[in-house]
Amino acid sequence: MKLWIHLFYSSLLACISLHSQTPVLSSRGSCDSLCNCEEKDGTMLINCEAKGIKMVSEISVPPSRPFQLSLLNNGLTMLHTNDFSGLTNAISIHLGFNNIADIEIGAFNGLGLLKQLHINHNSLEILKEDTFHGLENLEFLQADNNFITVIEPSAFSKLNRLKVLILNDNAIESLPPNIFRFVPLTHLDLRGNQLQTLPYVGFLEHIGRILDLQLEDNKWACNCDLLQLKTWLENMPPQSIIGDVVCNSPPFFKGSILSRLKKESICPTPPVYEEHEDPSGSLHLAATSSINDSRMSTKTTSILKLPTKAPGLIPYITKPSTQLPGPYCPIPCNCKVLSPSGLLIHCQERNIESLSDLRPPPQNPRKLILAGNIIHSLMKSDLVEYFTLEMLHLGNNRIEVLEEGSFMNLTRLQKLYLNGNHLTKLSKGMFLGLHNLEYLYLEYNAIKEILPGTFNPMPKLKVLYLNNNLLQVLPPHIFSGVPLTKVNLKTNQFTHLPVSNILDDLDLLTQIDLEDNPWDCSCDLVGLQQWIQKLSKNTVTDDILCTSPGHLDKKELKALNSEILCPGLVNNPSMPTQTSYLMVTTPATTTNTADTILRSLTDAVPLSVLILGLLIMFITIVFCAAGIVVLVLHRRRRYKKKQVDEQMRDNSPVHLQYSMYGHKTTHHTTERPSASLYEQHMVSPMVHVYRSPSFGPKHLEEEEERNEKEGSDAKHLQRSLLEQENHSPLTGSNMKYKTTNQSTEFLSFQDASSLYRNILEKERELQQLGITEYLRKNIAQLQPDMEAHYPGAHEELKLMETLMYSRPRKVLVEQTKNEYFELKANLHAEPDYLEVLEQQT
């Protein structure tokens, strides 16, 4: 009977156990309670971010299905052996932003299918030989932003398929030989470490297939040891992406790029050194005359090794070691000396409520880790004595208040972790004094507002993490003047994000994360779409998916057409983005018209082409303006010259005509009525003098016809003219100028100056007497003789006075040599120089 009862109970227990196990195997594991699960392309995505998970064993997954597991921002502090043995189908595991300080050997056993492992932003200090045991198929390993100082020689020896290794922002001083001998790396990131050199033998020779090598922000010593790296970099194929190696020492090379330095300047011909060590251990006292630093350091080492040889030096050598037993370390923390980085202080998860619990502060701290404590506020006086800090980790605390100026003395700080706290608002005063800060981590807070100018006190900020907050808008010019290269705005509350005055200030951007926001794919998002399309391929890390309107849910923003986002948008073919920029407005900013036009031009035409075109247009305008100015000046000069010529013609004595000797009509002169008593009797008496070859052919024909008609009467006319003029009171025998003398001058024109022979004499007489006295004297002399001999010549005298005292009429006469001879031929007496002088004055 007892036997049957025992069998019954055994079968009952077996059924109960079988019944209890069956739901576990058939259920969806942690997807029903702890985590969020989603299936995509046949792979289960298990999201367990920020669930307060302390142990990996708390996770259960569906059986026989490949999955990706995310354990971001939890409370993991250590990975124990076989922690992942039940996750054999995992192909990707994300353990970032925890406080993992140690990984036991065999922790990754059973993950033979794993291809990606993320252990970034933790507290790892060492990578041991068997740390990654069991990850034979691993292709991607991310271990950046830890405190790794040591990598053991065989740490990566079993990772025969590893292609991407990210180790930036650690404290690695050197890499062991042959560390990558069996690793087919194509991408290696070593930025932000303490490396001084990379040898060819044992390191560079094993990464010949590298495509992307990042080496910035290290402590490179540009000396002879770095020549191998320089030569190797120069021989790399042009398609490889190699970061700049910037010298940190010696001082005269600090800030210089290695590739731009000459080999002779980096490593001049090294001098020949003497041997410093003697096999017998004796000291080389003769070497003290040398001033070489390396010799002095070597000599000091030999002294320390031989205390028995110099007993008198023992007190001086041992005294410093007795005075410095070790660095001081606060009681709840662990400290480690990192040469040359300084003192590393580990105070994570020590239930520290305030930094005042660490007093007195240690000397020369470089890195202070306070992650995972219960600090609620940070006051201005808490960090006054930590001015030597280069890294401060305050992540995963309960900080709600950051007093303004709390970091005022941390002028050397380069990395600041404030992730996983309770901050709700950021202002400029919180970050005063952080002049050298390059990395700022503010993810997993409750930040709703960022005031304008918050990041201005950090002129060297490169990396900014603001993901997993509650941000909806960003103030204008929030990134202005900040050289950001990496920005994470993932998992916030952005429905749209203006490009103008916000995103367009990110001139040095290389990576931005905008996914997992409730994007409203409407007209307000057209500017963001066009900005994303202009970025390089890998700048935007993940897809930006629309949340609203409903018909665009889960649609990728970059792949949508602008007309779908904004149906009323009309694009101009020549300027495809001008209208969109004019129509898209945001509540946070107002778009300037000039800025809109300039932006539309730069969208349609490359900026370099636009600048070149504007330059050519400017040069063309300058030349046109100069040509117009020259033309105006030339025409003005010609006009002035013409006026001067006309004035000279008006004032020239050659143009004066005396009506008493007849009137002449040239080819430029208009006919006037006769103004002389003798004009009707004067018919060109000197035709042979008047002819000139400068006249036109028509004029010459008229002259020839006239000569043919009057040729026979020329002598008769000349003789009658002379006889008539002899009876004139002006040319009579009683006058000063006799007819015989004038006839001689009139007939001989060999001397061209005969017309003005007496001008100088009469001018002197005029200057002595004056115009009035001169006229009175001459008229008084002429009047009695004329009345005596020619009582009827009174009218001629009045006519002469009228001509002398009145201004002669202007005649448009061209001053030519022919007219000059013609005028001289028509004058039967010397011209009255008084009238000429009066005209000139």
Swiss-Prot record:
<feature type="topological domain" description="Extracellular">
    <location>
        <begin position="27"/>
        <end position="608"/>
    </location>
</feature>
<dbReference type="GO" id="GO:0005886">
    <property type="term" value="C:plasma membrane"/>
</dbReference>
<dbReference type="InterPro" id="IPR000483">
    <property type="entry name" value="Cys-rich_flank_reg_C"/>
</dbReference>
<feature type="repeat" description="LRR 8">
    <location>
        <begin position="412"/>
        <end position="433"/>
    </location>
</feature>
<dbReference type="GO" id="GO:0007416">
    <property type="term" value="P:synapse assembly"/>
</dbReference>
<dbReference type="InterPro" id="IPR032675">
    <property type="entry name" value="LRR_dom_sf"/>
</dbReference>
<keyword id="KW-0844">Vision</keyword>
<dbReference type="GO" id="GO:0031223">
    <property type="term" value="P:auditory behavior"/>
</dbReference>
<keyword id="KW-0812">Transmembrane</keyword>
<feature type="repeat" description="LRR 4">
    <location>
        <begin position="161"/>
        <end position="182"/>
    </location>
</feature>
<feature type="topological domain" description="Cytoplasmic">
    <location>
        <begin position="630"/>
        <end position="841"/>
    </location>
</feature>
<dbReference type="GO" id="GO:0021562">
    <property type="term" value="P:vestibulocochlear nerve development"/>
</dbReference>
<feature type="signal peptide">
    <location>
        <begin position="1"/>
        <end position="26"/>
    </location>
</feature>
<dbReference type="GO" id="GO:0060384">
    <property type="term" value="P:innervation"/>
</dbReference>
<keyword id="KW-1009">Hearing</keyword>
<keyword id="KW-1003">Cell membrane</keyword>
<feature type="repeat" description="LRR 9">
    <location>
        <begin position="436"/>
        <end position="457"/>
    </location>
</feature>
<feature type="domain" description="LRRCT 2">
    <location>
        <begin position="517"/>
        <end position="568"/>
    </location>
</feature>
<feature type="repeat" description="LRR 7">
    <location>
        <begin position="388"/>
        <end position="409"/>
    </location>
</feature>
<dbReference type="GO" id="GO:0007605">
    <property type="term" value="P:sensory perception of sound"/>
</dbReference>
<keyword id="KW-0209">Deafness</keyword>
<feature type="transmembrane region" description="Helical">
    <location>
        <begin position="609"/>
        <end position="629"/>
    </location>
</feature>
<dbReference type="GO" id="GO:0009986">
    <property type="term" value="C:cell surface"/>
</dbReference>
<feature type="domain" description="LRRNT 2">
    <location>
        <begin position="320"/>
        <end position="361"/>
    </location>
</feature>
<keyword id="KW-0472">Membrane</keyword>
<feature type="repeat" description="LRR 5">
    <location>
        <begin position="184"/>
        <end position="205"/>
    </location>
</feature>
<dbReference type="GO" id="GO:0035264">
    <property type="term" value="P:multicellular organism growth"/>
</dbReference>
<dbReference type="InterPro" id="IPR003591">
    <property type="entry name" value="Leu-rich_rpt_typical-subtyp"/>
</dbReference>
<dbReference type="Pfam" id="PF13855">
    <property type="entry name" value="LRR_8"/>
</dbReference>
<feature type="repeat" description="LRR 11">
    <location>
        <begin position="483"/>
        <end position="504"/>
    </location>
</feature>
<feature type="repeat" description="LRR 1">
    <location>
        <begin position="89"/>
        <end position="110"/>
    </location>
</feature>
<feature type="repeat" description="LRR 10">
    <location>
        <begin position="460"/>
        <end position="481"/>
    </location>
</feature>
<comment type="function">
    <text>Regulator of neurite outgrowth required for normal hearing and vision.</text>
</comment>
<dbReference type="InterPro" id="IPR001611">
    <property type="entry name" value="Leu-rich_rpt"/>
</dbReference>
<comment type="similarity">
    <text>Belongs to the SLITRK family.</text>
</comment>
<dbReference type="GO" id="GO:0051965">
    <property type="term" value="P:positive regulation of synapse assembly"/>
</dbReference>
<keyword id="KW-0732">Signal</keyword>
<feature type="repeat" description="LRR 6">
    <location>
        <begin position="364"/>
        <end position="385"/>
    </location>
</feature>
<feature type="domain" description="LRRNT 1">
    <location>
        <begin position="27"/>
        <end position="67"/>
    </location>
</feature>
<dbReference type="GO" id="GO:0090102">
    <property type="term" value="P:cochlea development"/>
</dbReference>
<feature type="repeat" description="LRR 2">
    <location>
        <begin position="113"/>
        <end position="134"/>
    </location>
</feature>
<feature type="repeat" description="LRR 3">
    <location>
        <begin position="137"/>
        <end position="158"/>
    </location>
</feature>
